Amino acid sequence: MVGVETKVLEIRPLQRISFFNDLYRSGFEAVVIDKGQENHMSMSLFSIIEKPKDTSEIVMNPSLVRSANQFYQALVQHQAFPQMQDLMCKELYGARLLVPVADPQKTTAVPVLTTGKGVRYYPAFTDLVEFGKFDRKHQFGAMEVRFRDLKKYLDYVNGIVVNPFGFALRLDGEKLDRIEKENMKLKVVK
């Protein structure tokens, strides 16, 4: 994959660990230091920060965020492949997501995002950072859901939007059904 040129940004010493932790949340696994010369230095992100050992208690989807960002960047550059979209959908199907609720003790969802054309979306988030972009005033609780749970919200809205202030993946009922059909596997339950 061809790299994307970026601007230089100074990260002050007190912000560096947070910055590198956010890179992990966003799906990065390596850092390349290049001062515009032919030689560059590459290193694993985990030589800078400690990779979380157990993320089972934390809702975080670095692989989904990475695959979605790669797909949308390639789409803008007219270089997207169907396999990139398939990978993003596979990661979404296996993801644990957060949805806002008015009262964390209840499963009734309240907040809805509406487009200028009146299309209503229920937001879902890959992690607490993305959830925080939506709930800046801390008005809502967060409830963990799986992909299969998203369809129940379609009774109230036209679709689901994953990370509305990030890659903003919009999913209507047809797209949810297609992703489920393409990724559903027979599982043996013991």
Tell where the protein language model's regions lie, with residue ranges.
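An interfacial alpha-helical scaffold signature
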Residues: 1-190
